[in-house]
Amino acid sequence: MNLLGKQQIWKDYQKEIADDKYFYARSCIRQTFFPGSEWAYLDILNNKLGKTVLDDPRHTTCTGIGYHSDVVPIETVMTVVARHFALMTEAGFENMTPSCITSFGIYTEILHTWETHPEWEEKTREFLWKATKREFQKPKNLAHTSDVIYKFRNEIAAQKKYSLVDIHTGRPLQV
């Protein structure tokens, strides 16, 4: 593939990432195996960068594992995701940042499905209302936590205490 083609693919991939006010969606897997990573993300954004990230204790799993295992039907997954969006909406947030890549994929897939098949969104809104008496707005911005960290990489780097360089040569450590 030529350079121009690669640049176009990269350009197509780029997305806008909100600057602040994120509704945080925890990961059922990540918080089990790497609990410090979720704490670190929240600490960096809230305390080091002064951003507002809401970690709502009412947030639940996205049911993605059950969906991908053919155990949970897509209508149920959509209703659970709609509940997450309702929690975000009720809190006054418009930007969602999921920690789990499965959740990010589920949210992305569902938003695309609703865009191309609005009848699915309408049905999901009915299910959510019947089950919880909640309504929701779709997120204006959906970005995985790794994308958010990458967005603020320079601000994070500017706060470092120590450089990971060889003190004798000034070259980056090979770790």
Residue ranges of model-derived segments:
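Iron-sulfur cluster-binding electron-transfer modules in prokaryotic oxidoreductases
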Residues: 1-175
